[in-house]
Amino acid sequence: MEVNEAGRILAGQLGESFSNMEWACRAFKSENHLLRLKAPSTLTMRWLLNVLKSFRENHAKPKIEIASVWMDFDTVDFSREPYDCAILLGNGYFGESTESRLLFSEWLIPVCTPSLLEPARHQLPECDLIHPSPDRRDWKRWLKRTGLFPGLDMGGGIVFDTLEQGSLAAMHGHGVAMADLRLTLDALKSGLLALPFREAIATGDGYYLVWPKNSLRGQSIERLLAWLNLNAPVVPSLDIVCLDFNEKRI
């Protein structure tokens, strides 16, 4: 018996359909066993690795497979990228096909080594400013919101791609960096970094756990979300002046 052209086409279509069914079944069966997570590099190094370590110590399932990547602007395309969920910095909207929950808000504040405290406080225009992004947006936002040092030249300084790189440069005494307050708590507590100013500004963005709507891994994602919320960094009493969008003390 010989299969004709129509039969070969049908066989190919059936083979593709069965492959899709097999993939879906595998995804369903692995619901409680593996969760693939995408996260920004600074957040991963400063907070997430320790939180995931404690998650593994307290939960047998799911296993978390993390990919820490550099992103100029945090995005994820679940239809093209091999992730089940992601932690992204943004305003909470990451597309109509996604769900998201806020973990914590972003607050920016200048940091430097203890030896640079006084020069930074009183002679900031003479100090090297460390920028965690090429567009220098974080220093611009902080200066505008606080009203300090009007007319400060933004043309010079040291430019990096991430908050992590900027913070490391500040730790080595290369200048005054703009940092995320919550992600810098350990360095502040250990004395590696200090706060020349007490004004922290809200950017309006925050770190969100994001996942596709109708995900087959919903239970695992909810379990991870609960643990992330439980271990969100809390700012201690540091006499911080937190400025919201209306520049009011809160």
Task: Walk through the language-model features, giving the residues of each.
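Alpha-helical "hinge/linker" immediately C-terminal to small N-terminal DNA-binding modules
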Residues: 1-30
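Hydrophobic residues within well-ordered alpha-helices
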Residues: 7, 78-79, 168-173, 188, ...
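Immediate post-signal peptide segment of exported/extracytoplasmic ligand-binding proteins
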Residues: 29-35, 124-125
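Central regulatory/effector-binding core of bacterial HTH transcription factors
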Residues: 33-94, 243-246, 250
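Short, well-ordered beta-strand segments
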Residues: 36-38, 86, 130, 177, ...
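C-terminal effector-binding regulatory domain of bacterial HTH transcription factors
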Residues: 57, 61, 185-190, 200-250
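Acidic, Gly/Pro-rich loop/turn segments at junctions of secondary structure
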Residues: 67-128, 134-138, 143-151, 157-159
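Hydrophobic hinge/microswitch elements
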Residues: 151-196, 202
